[in-house]
């Protein structure tokens, strides 16, 4: 773990957090019954990590350095997506007696995010010219 890598992840996280804030504010008008902004953020973030993670593998269409993958997948996507907000909003729905809406939020978030990662991977694998195993970003020591 180098200083440069830490800075890249930190900058990615800051940019992802800013993007999350902007999307949250812009989605307020549609978030009356369910926290659609958080769902949108988590689904789009899941798609981005699936797409980028596959396209940028060494055998992918756009291979990039591990630092770039860390910047996007850990920093940007980590700062952008928000499991803690999802959890708090689900708890608030349950506390307010909206148990069915809370369960819809849980099911919609989980199913849509997994589908978004899969879709991102499928699109990227197609662009790569065939099936490619999706790989997580390596967070091991830089050596």
Swiss-Prot record:
The chain crosses the membrane at residues 6-26, 38-58, 70-90, 103-123. GO terms for cellular component: plasma membrane. Belongs to the fluoride channel Fluc/FEX (TC 1.A.43) family. Its main location: membrane. GO terms for molecular function: fluoride channel activity; metal ion binding. It is a multi-pass membrane protein. Na(+) binds at residues 78, 81. It is found in: Cell inner membrane. Fluoride-specific ion channel. Important for reducing fluoride concentration in the cell, thus reducing its toxicity. It comes from Methylobacterium radiotolerans (strain ATCC 27329 / DSM 1819 / JCM 2831 / NBRC 15690 / NCIMB 10815 / 0-1). This is Fluoride-specific ion channel FluC. Keywords: Cell inner membrane, Cell membrane, Ion channel, Ion transport, Membrane, Metal-binding, Sodium, Transmembrane, Transmembrane helix, Transport. It catalyses: fluoride(in) = fluoride(out). Na(+) is not transported, but it plays an essential structural role and its presence is essential for fluoride channel function. InterPro entries: FluC (IPR003691).
């Amino acid at each position: 773990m180098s200083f440069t890598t830490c800075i890249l992840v930190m900058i990615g996280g800051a940019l992802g957090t800013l993007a999350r804030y902007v999307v949250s504010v812009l989605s307020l008008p549609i978030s009356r019954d369910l926290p659609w902004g958080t769902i949108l953020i988590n689904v789009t973030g899941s798609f981005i990590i699936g797409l980028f993670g596959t396209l940028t593998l060494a055998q992918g269409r756009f291979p990039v350095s591990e630092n770039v993958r860390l910047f996007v997948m850990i920093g940007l996507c980590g700062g952008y997506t928000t499991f803690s907000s999802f959890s708090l909003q689900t708890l608030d729905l349950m506390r307010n007696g909206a148990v069915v809406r809370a369960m819809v939020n849980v099911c919609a978030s989980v199913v849509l995010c997994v589908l978004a990662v899969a879709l991102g991977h499928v699109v990227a694998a197609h662009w790569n010219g065939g099936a490619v195993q999706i790989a997580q970003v390596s967070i091991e020591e830089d050596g």
